Amino acid sequence: MVTSEARGKAGLPALTTEQAARPEPTRAKLIGLILGPVLALVLFLLLPDSLGTGGRITAGVAALMATWWATEALPIPVTALLPMLLFPMLLPEVGIADVAPSYGADVIFLFMGGFMLALAMQKWNLHKRMALAIVASVGSNPVRLIGGFMVATGFITMWVSNTAATIMMLPVGISVVGLVIQLRGGKKDANFATALMLGIAYSASIGSVATLIGTPPNALMVGFLAENHDITIGFGQWMMVGVPLALTFLVVAWVVITRFVYPPATKKLEGAQDLIREELREMGPISRGEKLVAVVFVLAATSWIAIPLLARNETISSALPFLGDISDSVIAIAVAVALFLIPVDRQNRLLDWETAVRLPWGILLLFGGGIALSKQFGDTGLSEWIGLQVGVLENVPTWVMVLCIAVLVLLLTELTSNTATTATFLPVVAGIAMGMDLPVMTLVVPAVLAASMAFMLPVATPPNAVVFGSGHVSIGQMLRGGVWLNIIAVFMVMFTMYAFAGWAFGITL
């Protein structure tokens, strides 16, 4: 949620952007509350007995959760707790001890540690200094300036939530828009303002796919594959796929927005760099806290990439056998503990509990609920049954299925939470892949990548809602820019699968 204080700093009304962009759909929530159990019961009754009672119950619970997630009939994290309540009640062979471990899965601690690192960066304003430094380096050309904002936002959101990155960049962006109005004698350059706002929002979504901690769908995928298919994806391994996609798509999005959809009328922004440098000067010299967080940040990123590579080296692994037991989650928790230990001065440490408690605990519950649901898909044979039903698609070209999955998930995530969409569809997509005799990752990876590519509507993702609330972007303008990026995103996902994913994950497409 965007606080009133943050909006005040951004020059926005006191009403939160989520309220402005997404009014409380009380009627839709009530309909969803009733529709969920009805769909669950209908699905249970319609599915054949050959599936088994366990599979039919799991399908019903999945329908209930998907409906409540889509309509937000209950808060999304509360719906994520349903597996812990319903599976022990409805499945005699399943006890609470079988479901509860999903809420403490390895990947949840990876994200917890990543969140704490991000909170430490925000506490000491390191993320803001890094972003302003990047923007200050691009000059006063409007198109390049928008590119600088996009690079800065995209880089920050690799490590910090895309909502936080957008809120951080928005006040600076609004200040630059105000400067342009001043330079043009009170006349607004509508295209520049729109392109800058959309550039910030879109780069926040695009940059988040680069790392496992950048966006919840990535972490959900890691937990799902580890728990259900014994497939481990390392932090550095994912970056071999995520970073090329993010970099390429950032450039493409920048060109599309600034050259074709909303080309700025202003050719040069005198004073823009002075404004940004003034923001940097107001921050003062880099503090000891910022320096120490920067060191921890670099060590964390290096460890996530280097330790798995070192563990694969026979000479090194024989000399240091414990390296193989150091997972990405272990590194994340080590980083979190270090942040609480390292002193900045006699009174302060890099992270305190008052700051850490702001961690988005609801996202962690959502991870657990998604993993618990997907586990029952496998344990009850529902995934295998889905695979058998789509066996007729065995002769459909792989690229057609990748395309269809990407389009379907991308359209769904325009209307529902990308995390909830991912949690619902991962086991279904995996079942389809098995039915087509394809490696599970062939369809799971494009589904996860597409889940973070929502550009058309304010309700699609928090960054869109935040910039919509700025008053510089209308829904029509967002639709006009977003529809092109959505189309391009589908082909970017396909390109990434064939150019990088096959090589990085050892799958044949």
Where are these regions (language model features)?
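Long, highly hydrophobic alpha-helical transmembrane signal-anchor segments
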Residues: 83-88, 132-136, 140, 217-239
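Hydrophobic transmembrane alpha-helices of multi-pass small-molecule transporters
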Residues: 1-110, 227-229, 237-388, 485-490, ...
